[in-house]
């Protein structure tokens, strides 16, 4: 990989040869009230001082409102000799900088190990599609993915799609650049105002590319880390969308091929999520199964449920740190609660053993409360927040009226996640939870997945 030269702008201090007067000296000696540069929009609108905490200031947190924090960007200059390679491609330096320093950080758990930031410049030099996709997402992110998508974001998205069609047929383009481009197009699309659109066609396109990669034994043998990066990106995306895909449509990859590929990855540390590749595959299979029995309760398979439950409970890894361990336990419990609740929903029209049902409800409550506590062990300033919204929805929906304190923590955390990554799906998930809590408190508890589907929503969370 070639190294690009980075240099920060020199701070220019102007000086004057004129002597200062006593009045000027006294004026300069008086303390000056510094003006906030990073105060959130809410505090500025109220003309009050903001403590500039990120992603949520204390005032917004106390009032229980969304905090629209200003991004922390540094001035930088980058020597980019590769720009001359693509004279027909317009590079918006501001949007590119915004991606490198801000937006790309929402895709990883550790900003110091981020292949989607400065290391991606190598691929941007080769892929106009990736550059336009990045500029489109950056333009939308600046405006909190507003329902009125900025014109520049739409223009850049259109250019990205046009370039991508050409690049897919050209073998010299790196697979991770293509898959990142498609993933960003899906992100931009699902952040639009259409709550039914989760970027399905982009998911299926990526699935076809991964299938082709897994069939290519020479590629698997020679491009280890690059292939693992691509596979991990797909695994996480597939897990988040597995229950959104209609069961009658195209399903996952060949189970043997994908299982073997994940087994080969082992505990390889993926920059998006760490060492939980195997858990993501299990959770994706849980999501697909839950959607299947939701649509066709008569096809409930107790053997398959037992296998999935055993896979979830026995999965293990060695997380890099305790906070990552808390995130993995939240993922595991999300999968177990999802599986138990879907099974109970499928059998709700049948006679059930009251003792068995009561025991399972107690277990679900235990997992829900335990999971919230796991997630709250992760500070609100951590990049791990970007991967919490899906388990928060699952476990939050199970909290009872007696768990008001935990409900408040879930509310605060979803608002903080929105302030961090600005994806509207986080606020829609909170809205969904408020409806579910209201129904539960009135004696009508409901499973969150059918409730969401009845609203004709397909929220891509995580």
PLM-predicted stretches and their roles:
Residues 1-46, 56-107, 111-119, 126, ...:
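Intrinsically disordered, low-complexity regulatory regions with latent secondary structure
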Residues 2-17, 21-29, 37, 95, ...:
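Cytosolic regulatory protein-protein interaction regions
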Residues 51-55:
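Short linker/helix segments within small regulatory modules
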Residues 99, 117-123, 132-146, 156-196, ...:
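Hydrophobic/aromatic-rich effector regions of fungal transcription factors
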Residues 103-104, 186-288, 451-462:
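Acidic/serine-rich, low-complexity amphipathic helices located in mid- to C-terminal regulatory regions
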Residues 124-129, 172-176, 221-230, 270, ...:
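Structural motif
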Residues 144-151, 171-172, 193-196, 218-221, ...:
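Short, surface-exposed loop/turn segments at secondary-structure junctions
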Residues 151-155, 177, 197-202, 350, ...:
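Short sequence/structural elements of tandem HEAT/ARM alpha-solenoid repeats
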